Curated annotation (Swiss-Prot):
The organism of origin for this protein: Hamster polyomavirus
Alphabetical list of SMART domains matching this protein: DnaJ (SM00271)
A Pfam family the protein falls into: Papo_T_antigen
Protein task: Plays a role in transformation by modulating the activities of cellular proteins involved in control of cell proliferation and by acting as a functional homolog of an activated tyrosine kinase-associated growth-factor receptor. Recruits upon association with Ppp2/PP2A the Src tyrosine kinase component Fyn, thereby activating its kinase activity. In turn, MT becomes phosphorylated and mediates signal transduction pathways leading to cell cycle progression and cell division. MT also plays a role in regulation of early and late gene expression as well as viral DNA replication.
Keywords from the named record: Early protein, Host membrane, Host-virus interaction, Membrane, Oncogene, Phosphoprotein, Transmembrane, Transmembrane helix
Assembly and binders: Interacts with host Ppp2/PP2A A and C subunits; this interaction alters PP2A substrate specificity and localization. Interacts with host Fyn.
Domain annotation J: ranges: 12-75
Record protein name field: Middle T antigen
Main location: host cell
Amino acid sequence: MDRILTKEEKQALISLLDLEPQYWGDYGRMQKCYKKKCLQLHPDKGGNEELMQQLNTLWTKLKDGLYRVRLLLGPSQVRRLGKDQWNLSLQQTFSGTYFRRLCRLPITCLRNKGISTCNCILCLLRKQHFLLKKSWRVPCLVLGECYCIDCFALWFGLPVTNMLVPLYAQFLAPIPVDWLDLNVHEVYNPASGMTLMLPPPPADPESSTILTQEDTGPTLMGQQDTLTSRRNTGKSFSLSGMLMRTSPAKKSYHHQKMNSPPGIPIPPPPLFLFPVTAPVPPVTRNTQETQAERENEYMPMAPQIHLYSQIREPTHQEEEEPQYEEIPIYLELLPENPNQHLALTSTARRSLRRKYHKHNSHIITQRQRNRLRRLVLMIFLLSLGGFFLTLFFLIKRKMHL
């Protein structure tokens, strides 16, 4: 990022983009400024043609340099496309699940650097950082050569904390996914739901004609990187395959329109698996009968009873009967000791209680100290009085002699 353009070209591009120097390196912000300036400086809009040509030249040089830096890093596990053939950003690749795929759990993903087994985007780029340093044998990397969160924080001078993750997500969103050298099929997928069950295995495994495709690379919409077809042996060790072999009756729950390739997540089935007949509209009859049928469609409401009508003052002859409530099952597991707390206290209450006990213990210690001081002072005064009394008697005795 700092060696693609010269110092003069960098200052010229910053002035043409009306960009603050502190945002140099923020590709998304620079791209927005570039598009805005293109609308202002375009000759058809009445702009300056020379400035427009200079802006296009510098921006193209910067973009080609960033692409070339990532291309020359070494062998890639995914297919490399041309700079004009791949314009899909990282956020467009993952669309609605981008922010959940970026960081799976910030508490652990930010703490574990080289030993993380997570496959979110943040952890994958961090692992890529160590692999690049090992392959290049360089002491450090800068933004543009590596897009991990550590290089991002070092470039902009920010601490790596939980508050940095949203800024890092906004920074990575407009960057082309091909620059990141990520296999999008290996990125953490937080989508929840059922997976379509595989069809039942044939009687003869060798006669199966179902071919499965394995693909790699960041391509979408059917553009596969490497296609390797293998023959299905009819044995599936997945959960869906075992469920299919153990309970073949579950096939009847799936609708016929849900015949799509296996492995595609679909939302879970509704709560009511069996069809329920809709209520038949009432036939035009008398007005009173129609109104009664409409009211029967809804759940009957409890009769409204005034509170004061249910209260009775107890007399001396009549005693109040105790009202017993049904005890839930989980209460049977509670201890029989009534002094034991049944509800968990919060952390704030525990800290206040601990502080109160500490304060009380401190007060008791201070009282003991005061008592000890008084005792020592009393002993000192008594000894001092005895000393002066002895001295007085000695002087008086000498005077008589």
